[in-house]
C-alpha cells in the first residue's frame, strides 16, 4: 500500500541521514557504516512486522560491526545520545559491563510495538571483533529460548543473522552455523 511504501521510505531516509551525520561529525573515526546497505533497516522492519503478524514474540539478531550502529539506533531504538556518547569515549551504558569495549561491539534490547499493536522483543547480541563469531552463539540463544518456551515449531523466537561482506563462503564458521539450523 502507499502508506507502507511511505513508512519504508522514511526508514530508509532515517538510516541514510544517520550515516551522513556520523560521517560528518566523526571524521576519521571507525564506525563501520551501513553506507550502500541502508536497505537493511526497512528489510528488518518488514521482517519484524511480518513475523509478528505470524506469531513471532522475539527476534534475536546477530551481526558483525558493519551497520551495527544504524541497527542499534533504528531497530532497537538505542537513544542517539548513548550512541554519540560512545564516540566521545563514554561507552558505559549504566550496567557496568561494557568498560573498555568499543561502540560497534555493543548489544542492546528493546520491546518493539508493531503497527498492528503487537509486542515483539528485539535483541542485538554483543559481538567481538571476530567477524561471524556471534553466529553460533545466536543459534544457541534462540535454541535455549525455544526450548524454555516449548516452542517446538520454532516460530515464537527467531534468529536473524546478518552477514555484511563478501567472504561468506570463505569463513568456516558460516557453513558450520548453517549446519546448526537443522538441529
PLM segments and residue spans:
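Conserved internal helical-beta-strand scaffold that buttresses enzyme catalytic cores
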Residues: 1-183
Amino acid at each position: 500500500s502507499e502508506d507502507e511504501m511511505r513508512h519504508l521510505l522514511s526508514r530508509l531516509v532515517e538510516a541514510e541521514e544517520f550515516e551522513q551525520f556520523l560521517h560528518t561529525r566523526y571524521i576519521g573515526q571507525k564506525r563501520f557504516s551501513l553506507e550502500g546497505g541502508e536497505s537493511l533497516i526497512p528489510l528488518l522492519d518488514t521482517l519484524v512486522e511480518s513475523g509478528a503478524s505470524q506469531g513471532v514474540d522475539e527476534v534475536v539478531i546477530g551481526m558483525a560491526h558493519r551497520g551495527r550502529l544504524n541497527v542499534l539506533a533504528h531497530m532497537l531504538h538505542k537513544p542517539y545520545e548513548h550512541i554519540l556518547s560512545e564516540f566521545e569515549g563514554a561507552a558505559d551504558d549504566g550496567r557496568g559491563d561494557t568498560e573498555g569495549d568499543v561502540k560497534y561491539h555493543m548489544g542492546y534490547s528493546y520491546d518493539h510495538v508493531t503497527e498492528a499493536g503487537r509486542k515483539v522483543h528485539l535483541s542485538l547480541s554483543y559481538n567481538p571483533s571476530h567477524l561471524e563469531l556471534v553466529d553460533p552463539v545466536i543459534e544457541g540463544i534462540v535454541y535455549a529460548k525455544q526450548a524454555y518456551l516449548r516452542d517446538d515449531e520454532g516460530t515464537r523466537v527467531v534468529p536473524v543473522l546478518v552477514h555484511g561482506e563478501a567472504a561468506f563462503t570463505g569463513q568456516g564458521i558460516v557453513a558450520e552455523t548453517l549446519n546448526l539450523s537443522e538441529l
